[in-house]
Amino acid sequence: MAKTIEFDETARRKLLSGVNKLANAVKVTLGPKGRNVVIDKKFGSPTITKDGVTVAKEIELEDAIENMGAQMVKEVSTKTNDIAGDGTTTATILAQAIINEGLKNVTAGANPMALKHGIDKAVVVAVEEIKKHAIKINSKAEYANVATISANNDPEIGNLIAQAFDKVGKEGVITVDEAKSIETTLDIVEGMQFDRGYVSPYMVTDPEAMIATFNDPFILIYDKKIASMKDLLPVLEKIAQAGRPLVIIAEEVEGEALATIVVNTLRKTIQCVAVKAPGFGDRRKAMLEDIAILTGGQVISEDLGMKLENADVKMLGRAKKVVVDKENTTIIEGAGASKDIQGRVNQIKKQIEDTTSDYDREKLQERLAKLAGGVAVIHVGAATEVEMKEKKARVEDALSATRAAVEEGIVPGGGLTLLRAQDAVKALKLVGDEQTGANIILRALEEPIRMITSNAGLEGSVIVEQARARKGNEGFNALTMVWEDLIKAGVVDPAKVVRSALQNAASIGAMILTTEVTITDKPEPKDASGAGMGGMGGMGGMGGMGGMM
């Protein structure tokens, strides 16, 4: 296919146009007084949202080069969302400011590579400044503040998330679900969740929700593959006689064994679901042992001389309830002795202290959370489906932001932290176009506060100057329209969100500044041949050719 190649100023101007179209659609949502965006859907009702990444994901532009610019900025918001779960609008605004300011300088003759180096150096010191001022959070009120801000100043959502963290701890599992009523509620269930689902969809008990739910089941824990039915048959017969459901957790269930379980489940002879064991290698063995201790069962392991065909009901674990979906298994209220569980928890804590590997520490902390924490479920209720979707998205944002705040702490919100980071950038001593690159970041750092105040109906430049004149955490609260200590007022952002937004914006911004050529597919010409055929009607006169005979 033929390509269209654009160079220099023409290429950059079109990229900039695409960047601005996307960013202008996204930035109206920023701040407590940001506006909604209504997105048309081909099927069903339109989506109403104040979430930057949701808006960005919907945008596709007709012009190929403009669309490339838009897609690159879309990458900023999705990447920030993936890393920190929030801050997508801030990231987009920062990227737009860096690109607009940078391209002015490139057009004026600045060296794009030197600008990039200056931008990179400025971002490093700004990020260090953000980290330096981060405050660790531990209290329920602090969790509530972070979640409330991220949920567009909805204290109901903020308080629910704070309660969830308070109940299951920092490492606990918190999930978001749609409620059957208009009330938004929080349910706490003691239990363990791991990321493995059923091996066959024929095992579900609720075909509509595609989940298998068993009350008071036996749990068979086996560390090898189950392929032959003769190994499994003795246990299945004992379970069938007891008339109780069975959950099988094994390395793999396949072949004859899987076929027999599925057929008997469909015939309602037995209630059974098979799940692949979580983890790999030694970590899998350790996690199976965790499950065994939690449920009061034993890992049937050939390494210890046990055979599956000799397994007894006494070796099986028990739980009040087990819920299995396509991707996750949740064991609720395992029947294990609390002293055994506590002993296992202490053992894992000791391993966390002793390990030198960050990866191992992270995995051990995950195991600890699964064993010690519960499972919190936030049921989101609303009057209409449109409101439900919008509210659920806000709850998920707030949950991600709170997790980010737990990781790296909080900083003053309202764009103040980025503005305060200007001092560190000003202290940089650079020369030539590198200094110009640092100045681009200086200008970009004040853009979020400008936009927040602009969306609140005030002049951004005035608020920026007034904020500079004040010290510490004193900033402008766009919700109450007063100047106050933003930390005390609960106007806070997770440091991780602010940091990620700046880093991702600078990364894509610098890429666009150093772009010299764009190559796109040449649009195919509209097929005109079909339209011209109508004129052939005149060929009817060919009837007169009969006289030639």
Swiss-Prot record:
Catalytic reaction list: ATP + H2O + a folded polypeptide = ADP + phosphate + an unfolded polypeptide
CDD domains cross-referenced by the UniProt entry: GroEL (cd03344)
EC number(s) reported in the record: 5.6.1.7
A Pfam family annotated for this UniProt entry: Cpn60_TCP1
Record's subunit section: Forms a cylinder of 14 subunits composed of two heptameric rings stacked back-to-back. Interacts with the co-chaperonin GroES.
Family, similarity comment: Belongs to the chaperonin (HSP60) family.
Function per UniProt: Together with its co-chaperonin GroES, plays an essential role in assisting protein folding. The GroEL-GroES system forms a nano-cage that allows encapsulation of the non-native substrate proteins and provides a physical environment optimized to promote and accelerate protein folding.
Protein name as catalogued: Chaperonin GroEL
Organism encoding this protein: Leptospira biflexa serovar Patoc (strain Patoc 1 / ATCC 23582 / Paris)
Gene field: groEL
